[in-house]
A protein has these predicted regions:
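Long, charged, mostly alpha-helical binding arms that flank functional sites
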Residues: 4-166
Length: 166
């Protein structure tokens, strides 16, 4: 670049065409075009970006479906938000500050060791995928971890414990 006498980007990933949900080219004339500003306003940029990166590889054509964006917003971001809200509520009730002494992993309950192990595996998988410029499997792995392991298993099996009853 002009400022730093170096290239602006070392690597670029370019996406393919964004098609309608049936795989046809979007066109105002055909009535299948989507106003991106309306979609961003209604669902938010994070949901749109996540939908696009998790739905298909960036270099493949993307069959864009607004219902898919809504599903990502509800099922992934909604689950992530609810999981965090659950944690924040009970952490505040218990006076958790994050400055407590760290409990060694070996001394934690088995279910805590399980989720930590899965998280470490997830970090490794996501790092490898991103280093190989393969973002879609990384996004899908994160989504699966949040929806299935963190929310459906870990939080549900630990509710009584988090509520102070176990």
């Amino acid at each position: 670049t002009m400022l730093f006498d170096s290239v602006a980007f070392k690597n670029i990933i370019s996406n393919g065409l964004v098609l309608d949900k049936n795989g046809n080219k979007m066109s105002k004339r055909l009535g299948n075009a989507v106003d991106p500003f309306e979609v961003l306003e209604k669902y938010g940029t994070d949901a749109v970006r996540w939908y696009m990166i998790s739905n298909s590889q960036p270099w493949d054509n993307l069959k864009f479906d607004v219902d898919g964006v809504d599903e990502v917003r509800r099922k992934f971001f909604g689950t992530l938000y609810n999981t965090y809200s659950f944690f924040a509520l009970y952490a505040n009730v218990d006076g958790f500050t994050g400055r407590e002494a760290e409990i060694p992993v070996a001394e934690r309950p088995e279910i805590d060791r399980w989720i930590i192990s899965l998280l470490n595996t997830l970090v490794k998988e996501v790092t490898e995928s991103l280093e190989n410029y393969d973002p879609t499997p990384a996004a899908r792995a994160i989504q699966d971890f949040v929806n299935e392991n963190l929310s459906n298993w870990y939080v549900r099996l630990n509710r009584k414990r988090f509520w102070g009853g176990g």
